[in-house]
Regions:
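Carbohydrate-active catalytic/glycan-binding domains of CAZyme proteins
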Residues: 1-209
């Protein structure tokens, strides 16, 4: 659903638009720009009330260029790009972009029992594409993991799924886990772990559709 927005007109006064929130469930709310037509003094959004998936941009009164994201995901610049956000207030003593240029270094700042308690979880918003999957791929250096440490990738929804490398009994394991953020009826957490030969660097990928 799309709701909770504001009406705006273009500088030339010939077009009306609305910026609204699109509720996509567990993926959150996305800003959504839709054209507006007036019928009998009532604003009609999109195509007779149905939002457009794509449409021409508003007339802004000036030439505009397509603006990609101002930064990329390679961790080669400081500070972090605007597409990143911490899930909690971070422990700034336990992460760095400067100690190893081109890498985000994370240290274990505390031992916790649940993923939701991990402070230095760096996230990006998942985009709800209708016809293609959203995908994230990470490159991890796990050479310095200590007993009990986890490092990996997660689709942080409710329920969530994670794929990680952990050290247990001085051996690296590849772990997949699905669990909930809150108590849900008729849900049983699942976990699979397998001891595998892992070098210093591993690639992990998560996909959601």
């Amino acid at each position: 659903t799309i709701h909770q927005g504001s009406l705006i007109d273009t500088p030339d006064g010939n077009e009306w638009w609305t910026i609204m929130q699109q509720d996509v469930g567990c993926l959150g709310r996305f800003p959504n720009l839709q054209p507006v037509k007036w019928t009998d003094d009532w604003p009609i959004v999109g195509n007779k009330g149905v939002p457009y998936e794509t449409t021409n941009k508003p007339v802004t009164g000036a030439a505009t260029k397509r603006q990609p994201l101002p930064t990329n995901d390679n961790f080669r610049s400081y500070p972090l790009g605007m597409q990143w956000q911490w899930n909690h207030n971070p422990d700034n003593s336990a992460w760095s972009l400067l100690e190893r240029p081109g890498w985000l270094r994370l240290r274990t700042s505390a031992t916790v029992s649940r993923l939701t308690q991990a402070r230095n979880m760096l996230t990006q918003r998942i985009y709800a594409f209708e016809k293609s999957a959203s995908m994230g791929t990470i490159r991890l250096d796990v050479s310095k993991l200590q007993e009990g440490d986890y490092a990996g990738i997660c689709i942080f929804l409710d329920p969530y799924s994670m794929l990680a490398v952990r050290v247990k009994d001085r051996q690296k394991q590849l772990v997949w886990r699905q669990d909930t953020l809150r108590v849900h009826d008729n849900f049983t957490p699942s976990e699979r772990a397998e001891a595998v030969e892992i070098g210093d660097v591993i690639y992990l990928r998560a996909t959601i559709s």
